[in-house]
């Protein structure tokens, strides 16, 4: 079998003093924390599309990336080479999961029947490679946004034929995700939204989206797919407005259509910031709803208004993200998928490794800091004290539903002073900084 990365050694943990760009500084996959190796807390995954398909094209320029698998001109040879490259890449980095869209892994034929046959051949190759490897499928998905047929949407299109095409495509994607043992299946509605309301039947589009998701739930039951269904919110791009705007919007939609019990969320950092939220906000919202499923690990650039999908290197953000994951009880059928691409000018194969190492180290460090914060109950203690008034007296009655407007008026009407606690934001922020510094100082 062809080797795609002969110059890259197996990436080792060398510790915080290491200056080797091809080594982990903070991430030791086998380090046991809370009875579990770090690799099982973090469940890193490679995104097939960014790492093996994307070639560094942007709206202004041609591909820049050096990718040895693209030397093959035959589309099938290229597809198989990408699969082989994925397995070699994951093994060298000690990454146990990957994610893909149907159209990332195999070229399209003239009809859907032909496309499905081609897809089956590549799925066979993946299954073959899985046999003697630890690499597993985190989640699969269908690309319902690249082909021109999806210009008006997929489940929310104006064309019943396109709706049928999308349904058949998801049906097949569910089958192959099941066949490959995928832990989850993602719905990201890249074209499920609108450009202008002047030409949009908003009511019908939303109803059709619900019909589509229900059919997916029913088909998954029928074939015995037990993976977790995940909605990935994003407010805009490529459409001006996307229906799964953020966690709160998507949750209300699911509730409204009686679909909430079947779905959790796949939260992407860059999508959170595009929605005007922090990554932490989206994760917290999903957590309190009991719906934190998986994460697309990346970061955006706050000065740019689009989805830059950069490798996550911001310790503060990964700390707050892992804090939410820990408080949610950790990942079950989910993980940290690097939906991230190296910059167009980082065009060497080596940069793919460096990007993933940077992301893995940053999340490992974030996890360690967050673990201490959670264990010491730093924020919990503060929050509990801040809301103490709801634990006794009138507050307790409010919480237990034992009071009403009249009783509350009677209680408060002659009271002269109300005593309030301080929010102490600055104190908590500097405490967080101390935990970051303390954790780093204790690292090997
Ligand atoms: C695009 C999305 C997409 C989903 C999967 O912005 O992040 O890649 O994760 O379809
Ligand atoms: Ca994503
Ligand atoms: Ca993205």
From Swiss-Prot:
Binding positions for Mg(2+) 1 per the UniProt entry: 232, 268, 296, 339
EC number: 5.3.1.5
GO MF: magnesium ion binding; xylose isomerase activity
Names of the cofactor(s): Mg(2+)
Annotated Mg(2+) 2 binding sites: 268, 271, 307, 309
Top class in the EC scheme: isomerase
Top-level taxon of the source organism: Bacteria
Cofactor note: Binds 2 magnesium ions per subunit.
Entry annotation: catalytic residues: 101, 104
UniProt cross-references to Pfam families, sorted A to Z: AP_endonuc_2
A cellular component term, taken from the record's GO annotations: cytoplasm
The keyword Magnesium belongs to this UniProt entry's keyword annotation: yes
Cited Gene3D superfamilies: Divalent-metal-dependent TIM barrel enzymes
Catalysed reactions, as listed in the record: alpha-D-xylose = alpha-D-xylulofuranose
Keywords for this protein: Carbohydrate metabolism, Cytoplasm, Isomerase, Magnesium, Metal-binding, Xylose metabolism
Subunit structure: Homotetramer.
HAMAP family documented for this protein: Xylose_isom_A
Family to which the UniProt record says this protein belongs: Belongs to the xylose isomerase family.
Protein name: Xylose isomerase
Source organism per UniProt: Thermotoga sp. (strain RQ2)
Lineage of the species this protein comes from: Bacteria, Thermotogati, Thermotogota, Thermotogae, Thermotogales
